[in-house]
Amino acid sequence: DVVSFTGSTRAGREVARAAADGIKRVTQELGGKSANIILDDTADFGKAVFSGVLNCFGNSGQSCNAPTRMLVPKARMGEAIESAKAAAAKAVVGDPNSEGTSLGPVVSELQFNKINALIEAGIKEGAELIAGGPGRPDGLDKGYFIKPTVFANVTNDMTIAREEVFGPVLTIIGYEDDADAIAIANDTEYGLSGYISGEPAHAQQIALQIRTGMVHINGAPLDISAPFGGYKKSGNGREWGLEGFEEYLETKAMMGAA
């Protein structure tokens, strides 16, 4: 009666088509290209950038809700670049079983090749490479290891800002003002998650205008009591919370005469 699927948007389309003949309800948690807006009134701007980079690299970047597009005021791009470089330098790629490793390999050769192709596209399209790049990290001559990669001065029409990379690749995009930041954040086919750092009331006001199913403010973590899911091509339905249970329930009306 219901199909629940987590995966890429491309695969989600095929699942929905396959379920259509049976008129099954379909709930899907699909891709994302989440914006991480660092507001000018953030209490510790450098720390917000630093942690945003490392959050993007979590699970080797293989997270649907990863904050892969960092939005910073154009006037503070230089400051953001320095903090991002420092964060990328802290990332240690290697055997996941080794102490001190923070990033392991990506899942497959197919994904390895896709990520490297997108990194090459970023370079070709004129994004400023400030950390990482194509190929394996030094000292790793085999395995599907990706260099933790950061691009700065990215524009939102570049391939690396449009496509879900699903790897440790961050883009830093400059914005003029709040309206510009909101427009850039919403200029994507995805709508899974969003991240905002700034003065709390200001951040909440921005969060209300971001078209995503979830927004994390000032580093707040996921909450399993809150519904998890997105808008647009990031899927439909919800996991977690009361709404997550309701996806698996049927409504029945019973009428009886006295």
Regions found by a protein language model. Give the residues of each.
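Conserved phosphate-binding and hydrolysis motifs of nucleotide-dependent enzymes
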Residues: G7-S8, G167
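Short catalytic-loop micro-motif centered on adjacent basic/acidic residues
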Residues: V2-F5, S193-Y195
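ALDH superfamily catalytic-core signature
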Residues: V2, S8-T155, I217
